[in-house]
Amino acid sequence: PKFKAEGGYSKVAESVFVAALFTYAGPNFVGILNHLGKKNDAAKAQAEIDKMKKVIMESAWDGNWFMRAYDANGQKMGSHECEEGQIFIEPQGFAIMSDIDKDATKKTLAAIDERLNTKHGLVLNNPAFSKYYIQYGEISTYPGGYKENAGIFTHNNAWIICAAAYAGEGNQAFKYYSEIAPAYTEETSDIHKTEPYVYGQISGGKDAGSYICQTGKNFGQGKYSWLTGT
């Protein structure tokens, strides 16, 4: 269905992030059902989890990482085929911790390190959006390097730290932890600027400052201290 700027969205859009959350949380639900003696329900739930894993690999695996979504036009979001926003952080960690595919896990961790990691933490997406996309809405309204447009969200950095540790990549996990943990960022307080003893919601991504034609000027600068689920 054709996307309409007015009159609402179609029901075509699908979130790969939510699909990965389903496969991640599902086994806990299966465990509860088994504990309650509801074996038939547990088997049905497990079948749906296995089905979702297969669908994710068939429809959302981009070759080196997991896509972010299909938009309201049914077009790929978070794919190497996209002009901007080719890779997003959100689905990666939960797809890894869901054991969807071992080979995919290795490739995803490598892509995260190559495409998302910076000395101040993992950016939410890369490349940043440089213009407004009506099908994406709010995320493409922020300047590059801020908030959901390639900012460094400490909250979802934690998901990748957990995923790397889960996959047995302890050194990679600790590297990411060290990039955002207050105990390890004291030396960059002059850049970070927020209280050095607390997490903030975001830090400026590598593109921060592009809105004043000084890309990188505010890279690593903290924002919204205390306000985070990290």
Residue ranges of model-derived segments:
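Catalytic cores of carbohydrate-active enzymes
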Residues: 21-136, 177-219
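A glycine-rich beta-turn/hairpin centered on an aromatic-Pro dipeptide
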Residues: 106, 229-230
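Active-site-proximal binding-pocket segments
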Residues: 155-156, 171-173, 189, 198
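Solvent-exposed loop and edge beta-strand segments that line ligand/cofactor-binding
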Residues: 3-19, 74-98, 139-157, 162, ...
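Catalytic-core region of carbohydrate-active enzymes that cleave or remodel glycosidic bonds
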Residues: 162-185
